[in-house]
């Protein structure tokens, strides 16, 4: 499974629904799309939260990102990520 970083920004609508139950629903939604929530963090700065998730592929990650926005009112920027060891191997192979 591939790792994806999901940076979230609260909208006014999204701020109204902050609950532990919504967080549980979000994790279940990722699972419904073939993913697994590995970690979640609240942030200070231009982004308000970070979800680290694994998905089988880009299609599942994109669908989950869109579904999360519909569920929560939070906008997400979702990016694939590789470990530094994977990156070093890719760099060596070029």
Annotate each PLM feature.
Residues 37-40, 76-78:
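Generic structural signal for residues in well-ordered beta-strands
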Residues 1-31, 36, 44-47, 82-94:
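Short S/T/G/P-rich N-terminal loop/turn motif that feeds into the first structured element of a domain
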Residues 56-85:
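An amphipathic, aromatic/His-enriched active-site/gating alpha helix that lines ligand/cofactor pockets
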Residues 4-9, 41-64:
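Short, well-ordered beta-strand segments in beta-rich or mixed alpha/beta enzyme
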């Amino acid at each position: 499974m591939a790792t994806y970083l999901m940076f979230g920004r609260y909208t006014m609508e999204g701020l109204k629904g902050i609950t532990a139950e919504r967080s549980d629903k979000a994790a279940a939604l990722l699972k419904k799309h073939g993913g697994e929530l590995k970690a979640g963090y609240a942030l200070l700065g231009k982004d308000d939260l970070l979800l680290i998730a694994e998905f089988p592929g880009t299609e599942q990650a994109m669908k989950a990102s869109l579904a999360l926005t519909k569920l929560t009112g939070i906008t997400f920027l979702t990016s694939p990520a590789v470990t530094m060891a994977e990156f070093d191997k890719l760099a060596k192979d070029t």
